[in-house]
C-alpha cells in the first residue's frame, strides 16, 4: 500500500528539488513526487494575470511504500532534503490530509484551482471552486491578493496555507465574466 510522506526542502526550490529527487531516487521506490500548488491571480500593470504558487512552501509530497529507501537516496544528495520523521519514525500524512489534498487536486495535475466568492455585505459566500463546502477551513481572506488563508493539520502540526480565492461584488463578477467571454 502506498502512503504519502512529506519531504522538506529549501523554501523556493521545490521545483528544482522535485526534478533532482526524481532523477536520484529509482522509479520503483516512488509512485509520485509532487509539490501541490494553488492557482491565483495577481494584478500586473492593471491587468489580472493567472499564476501558480506553492501550497506548502518548502515541502514536497512523496507517494511511496518505502520512505527509508527514499531517505537513503536523499542523504546522498548535496542539497538539503529529508523525509519528515518524529522520534526516528517516518510520519505519513493522515488519511484526512491525503483526502483533502487529493480532493483539491488529482494525479498529474497537483494545482488547486482558484475558487470564486461573492461579497454580500460583510459576508463572503464561496460560489465555485474547491473551497465550496470547505468554508470552515478559511481563517482570513486577503481580497487584494486574491487569497484565502486556511488552517489545517499537516503531519500533526497546525499549518497555515494559502489558496486562490477571487472575492467579487455581483457587478464586478458580471464584468469579469464578460471580459473573459470577449477575450
Task: Give the residues covered by each predicted segment.
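Acidic-enriched and Gly/Ser
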Residues: 1-123, 137, 145, 149-183
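Short, conserved beta-turn/loop elements at beta-strand boundaries and strand-helix junctions
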Residues: 129-131, 141-146
Amino acid at each position: 500500500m502506498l502512503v504519502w510522506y512529506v519531504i522538506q526542502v529549501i523554501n523556493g526550490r521545490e521545483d528544482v528539488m522535485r526534478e533532482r529527487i526524481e532523477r536520484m531516487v529509482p522509479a520503483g521506490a516512488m509512485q509520485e513526487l509532487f509539490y501541490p500548488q494553488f492557482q491565483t491571480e495577481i494584478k500586473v500593470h492593471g491587468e489580472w494575470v493567472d499564476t501558480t504558487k506553492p501550497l506548502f512552501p518548502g515541502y514536497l509530497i512523496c507517494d511511496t511504500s518505502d520512505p527509508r529507501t527514499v531517505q537513503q537516496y536523499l542523504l546522498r544528495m548535496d542539497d538539503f532534503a529529508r523525509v519528515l520523521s518524529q522520534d526516528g519514525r517516518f510520519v505519513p500524512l493522515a488519511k484526512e490530509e491525503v483526502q483533502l489534498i487529493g480532493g483539491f487536486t488529482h494525479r498529474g495535475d497537483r494545482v488547486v484551482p482558484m475558487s470564486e466568492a461573492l461579497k454580500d455585505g460583510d459576508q463572503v459566500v464561496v460560489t465555485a471552486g474547491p473551497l465550496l463546502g470547505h468554508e470552515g477551513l478559511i481563517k482570513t481572506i486577503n481580497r487584494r491578493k486574491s487569497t484565502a488563508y486556511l488552517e489545517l493539520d499537516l503531519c500533526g502540526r497546525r499549518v497555515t496555507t494559502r489558496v486562490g480565492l477571487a472575492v467579487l461584488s455581483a457587478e464586478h463578477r458580471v464584468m469579469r465574466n464578460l471580459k473573459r467571454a470577449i477575450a
